């Protein structure tokens, strides 16, 4: 075995081992082996004795041993700290897994409940429809009234079941909202605990690192003193060799100095000639610059005289300004007296206006009470009118359906019996309708859906317009998505007082967009903004609130060339604009009732509905009916003439029968035998073929 291999084995035994279970120790052992191999090659190349290296490597360095011990202790401390911190994450993951399992079970139960309710509702509806079909043939008003009441009670029961299901789902939704807030709070507490443990681990690590660093520094200091003692001897030997080499280099330097002096003499001669040439050139340049200096002095004298004149003019103007300032001070004194008088008048007018305001407030309250009473009466009359309208509609609709059914039966008889054609029933989808037609309200997105779409658009240069269609006779509005996003961000930043402090603390760890959406939800709830149209109203109002003062400024004076005619609202004006919006545009909102639907219904659909009933039988069938009517009239005339002919034929047959009877009696009479030439013989001779 070579000396290098023995040294490698000894260093492996003394330091980190390649067979260690710790990966860091194996890496460190490989590094030490590579360093030892390189050092051995270097010493072998320099001719040093490897026995000295063997003596040095027999014992491991104290610094390496202390460093390895410190590394192991610190690694164990870091692993323990990481395990302590990850315990929180593991507990959170387990809790989230449990919550998801419970959520799946609740979702399954809710789906089963909805399916059962849908089946029961469908069975009730089929029972109501079947009962209506069976009782439709009854024409007694009293029985019809009882049947209608029964059907109405069953429909009310069905609607009540639906409302109960909706109420249960809303309660479940509120419970989920509360659970969501609690989960957010729990997550915030877990994060605080996690941060606290991490800070504690950081403090412990810093403290331990400092202690280990002090120990390592002490060991290195001890090794340093030992190395200084060993290197000092080597240094003295090297200094002696250095003195000898310096003496040799000094002798060679003296020789080079003599050579350099000769070269310097030659360079001085060359530089002297170049200096004379440059001196002549520079003297010429100096003369040219002196001429330019004289010209500059003349220009300076002229400018000085101009400045003296301007100074005298400014001094005269300063005296005039002093006189004007004294006059303005006297004018300010007079205006101060006028201001005091105006303040007294203002105080009187404020008092008077307060009294008038109180009187107007009393009148306003009285008018509001009258308005509420009038509104109550209007709702009552609207309900009565709606009920009457519905009753008349149902009566006319029933009569219309009966007439249409009779016409269809007549058309079927004509097609099948008279024309012998296959009868195809027309489209009678309007016959399925019962009751007045309700106008279809336009579907609108919610305010939060619009806010989510706008906030999720990250393109800063997006100039696409968010257009809104015509609603209640208004023209469609176009507002850029960038403007809507900027206005909503201003609302989030400036309307923080509308958000609860508890919710604000919970939103702090979220991202900016998610935090803005939750803030907008609270702000929209406070302002009563529920649908897309309300959001555009708010944005347009804020834009107008910004433009109106600018338009007043344009009327009072001219704008600067670089100023913008239309800018977005400033953040300082947001609160005043929101207050004005609430006072001017916000109205109490209620649920959309059936009366409101009846008021907003489109009467054009009524015309189309009744026109569809009138056109249940197409125009082509009417032309067929007209042609059939004229043909039947002609057929009736033919049948009439045939009836007359049949009557005449019956009469002739009766006469013929009587004549045959008389003839038979005459032929069978006994008197014919007694005659020599009976009439029958003559008849047979005249008619032999008979």
Curated annotation (Swiss-Prot):
Domain of life from the UniProt record: Eukaryota
Coiled-coil regions listed in the entry: 92-419
GO BP: axonemal dynein complex assembly; cilium-dependent cell motility; regulation of cilium movement
Keyword Coiled coil attributed: yes
Region (Disordered): 1-25, 49-72, 451-476
Pfam family, one: NYD-SP28
Subcellular location(s) of the protein: Cytoplasm, Cytoskeleton, Cilium axoneme; Cytoplasm, Cytoskeleton, Flagellum axoneme
InterPro entries for the chain: DRC1/2_N, DRC1/DRC2, DRC1_C
Keyword line: Cell projection, Cilium, Coiled coil, Cytoplasm, Cytoskeleton, Flagellum
GO CC field: axonemal dynein complex; axoneme; motile cilium
Similarity section: Belongs to the DRC1 family.
Quaternary assembly: Component of the nexin-dynein regulatory complex (N-DRC).
Known role: Component of the nexin-dynein regulatory complex (N-DRC) a key regulator of ciliary/flagellar motility which maintains the alignment and integrity of the distal axoneme and regulates microtubule sliding in motile axonemes. Plays a critical role in the assembly of N-DRC and also stabilizes the assembly of multiple inner dynein arms and radial spokes. Coassembles with CCDC65/DRC2 to form a central scaffold needed for assembly of the N-DRC and its attachment to the outer doublet microtubules.
Protein name (record): Dynein regulatory complex protein 1
Provenance organism: Xenopus laevis (African clawed frog)
């Amino acid at each position: 075995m070579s000396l290098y291999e023995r040294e490698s084995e000894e260093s492996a035994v003394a330091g980190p081992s390649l067979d260690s279970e710790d990966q860091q120790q194996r890496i460190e052992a490989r590094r030490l082996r590579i360093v030892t191999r390189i050092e051995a090659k270097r010493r072998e190349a320099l001719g040093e004795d490897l026995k000295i290296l063997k003596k040095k490597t027999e014992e491991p360095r104290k610094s390496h041993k202390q460093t390895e011990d410190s590394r192991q202790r610190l690694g164990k401390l870091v692993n323990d700290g990481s395990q302590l911190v990850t315990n929180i994450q593991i507990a959170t993951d387990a809790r989230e897994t449990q919550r998801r399992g419970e959520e799946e079970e609740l979702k399954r139960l809710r789906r089963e409940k909805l399916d059962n309710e849908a089946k029961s509702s469908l069975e009730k509806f089929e029972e109501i429809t079947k009962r209506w079909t069976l009782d439709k043939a009854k024409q007694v008003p009293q029985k019809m009234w009882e049947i209608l009441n029964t059907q109405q009670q069953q429909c009310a029961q069905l609607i009540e079941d639906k409302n109960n299901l909706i109420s249960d789902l809303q309660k479940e939704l509120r419970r989920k909202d509360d659970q969501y807030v609690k989960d957010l709070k729990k997550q915030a507490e877990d994060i605080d605990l996690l941060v606290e443990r991490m800070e504690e681990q950081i403090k412990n690590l810093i403290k331990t690192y400092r202690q280990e660093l002090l120990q390592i520094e002490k060991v290195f200091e001890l090794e340093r003193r030992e190395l200084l003692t060993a290197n000092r001897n080597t240094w003295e030997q090297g200094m002696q060799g250095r003195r000898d080499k310096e003496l040799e280099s000094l002798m060679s330097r003296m020789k080079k100095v003599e050579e350099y002096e000769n070269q310097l003499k030659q360079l001085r001669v060359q530089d002297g000639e170049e200096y004379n040439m440059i001196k002549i050139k520079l003297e010429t340049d100096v003369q040219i610059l002196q001429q330019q200096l004289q010209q500059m002095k003349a220009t300076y004298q002229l400018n000085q005289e101009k400045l003296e004149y301007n100074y005298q003019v400014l001094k005269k103007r300063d005296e005039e300004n002093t006189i004007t300032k004294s006059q303005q001070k006297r004018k300010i004194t007079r205006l101060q007296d006028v201001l005091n008088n105006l303040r007294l008048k203002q105080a009187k007018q404020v008092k008077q206006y307060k009294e008038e305001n109180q009187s107007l407030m009393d009148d306003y309250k009285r008018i509001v009470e009258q308005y509420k009473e009038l509104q109550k009466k209007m709702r009552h009359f609207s309900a009565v009118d709606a009920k009457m309208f519905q009753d008349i509609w149902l009566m006319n609709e029933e009569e219309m359906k009966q007439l249409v059914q009779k016409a269809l039966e007549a058309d079927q008889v004509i097609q099948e019996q008279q024309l012998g054609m296959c009868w195809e029933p027309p489209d009678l989808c309007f016959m399925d309708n019962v009751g007045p037609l309700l106008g279809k309200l336009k579907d609108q997105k919610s305010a939060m859906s619009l806010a989510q779409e706008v906030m999720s658009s990250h393109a800063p240069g997006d100039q696409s317009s968010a257009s809104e269609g015509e609603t209640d006779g208004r023209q469609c509005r176009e507002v850029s998505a960038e403007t809507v996003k900027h206005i909503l961000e201003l609302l989030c930043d400036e309307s923080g007082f509308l958000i609860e402090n508890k919710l604000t603390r919970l939103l702090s760890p979220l991202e900016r967009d998610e935090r803005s959406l939750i803030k907008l939800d609270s702000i929209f709830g406070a302002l009563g903004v529920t649908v897309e149209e309300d959001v555009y109203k708010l944005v347009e109002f804020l834009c107008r609130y910004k433009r109106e003062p600018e338009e007043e400024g344009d009327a009072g004076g001219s704008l600067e060339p670089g100023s913008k005619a239309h800018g977005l609202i400033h953040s300082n004006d947001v609160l005043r604009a929101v207050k004005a919006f609430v006072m001017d545009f916000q109205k109490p909102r209620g649920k959309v009732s059936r009366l409101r639907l009846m008021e907003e219904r489109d009467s054009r659909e009524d015309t189309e509905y009744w026109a569809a009933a009138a056109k249940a039988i197409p125009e082509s069938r009417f032309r067929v009916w007209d042609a059939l009517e004229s043909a039947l009239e002609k057929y009736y005339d033919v049948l009439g003439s045939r009836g007359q002919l049949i009557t005449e034929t019956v009469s002739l047959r009766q006469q013929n029968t009587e004549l045959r009877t008389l003839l038979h009696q005459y032929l069978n009479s006994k008197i014919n035998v007694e005659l020599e030439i009976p009439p029958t013989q003559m008849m047979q001779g005249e008619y032999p073929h008979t």
